[in-house]
């Protein structure tokens, strides 16, 4: 049996925070605002995985009203989600992600992101795709106010 999940997330830029995307710290003058470390890509992947097994979203499992998740490492949150997915009897088929950002350029960091995500999801890097695009200076990402991401995951019964 196969299950498909889709995830989407957005975070706003702010001064004085690190920029962490896909589990990788990226040099930039601003980071993203969030209750956790605001890793927009890992949040998107978690939502896609949870959606594939009809288990809600990241906010249901790690609410931003719970102080236990304040400044949480999104890699740890994704590991917990992945453990839950595996407990339901699923493994990863493949994952395809898109980061939507005007700046900074993501290309130099894509392979590091793929490697980190493959580690977190206990799979071959060949099952992980990460790409980036801009909105040609349109909308909030084009105005460099934040970053968005999308992901689609295919899970299969073990």
Curated annotation (Swiss-Prot):
The record marks 35, 134 as: Transition state stabilizer. Its cofactor is a divalent metal cation. Its EC number is 4.6.1.12. It catalyses: 4-CDP-2-C-methyl-D-erythritol 2-phosphate = 2-C-methyl-D-erythritol 2,4-cyclic diphosphate + CMP. The keyword Metal-binding applies. 4-CDP-2-C-methyl-D-erythritol 2-phosphate binds at residues 9-11, 35-36, 57-59, 62-66, 101-107, 133-136, 140, 143. It is an enzyme of class 4 (lyase). GO terms for molecular function: 2-C-methyl-D-erythritol 2,4-cyclodiphosphate synthase activity; metal ion binding. Keywords: Isoprene biosynthesis, Lyase, Metal-binding. Binds 1 divalent metal cation per subunit. A divalent metal cation binds at residues 9, 11, 43. CDD domains: MECDP_synthase. Pathway: Isoprenoid biosynthesis; isopentenyl diphosphate biosynthesis via DXP pathway; isopentenyl diphosphate from 1-deoxy-D-xylulose 5-phosphate: step 4/6. GO terms for biological process: isopentenyl diphosphate biosynthetic process, methylerythritol 4-phosphate pathway; terpenoid biosynthetic process. Homotrimer. Involved in the biosynthesis of isopentenyl diphosphate (IPP) and dimethylallyl diphosphate (DMAPP), two major building blocks of isoprenoid compounds. Catalyzes the conversion of 4-diphosphocytidyl-2-C-methyl-D-erythritol 2-phosphate (CDP-ME2P) to 2-C-methyl-D-erythritol 2,4-cyclodiphosphate (ME-CPP) with a corresponding release of cytidine 5-monophosphate (CMP). Belongs to the IspF family. This is 2-C-methyl-D-erythritol 2,4-cyclodiphosphate synthase. The gene is ispF.
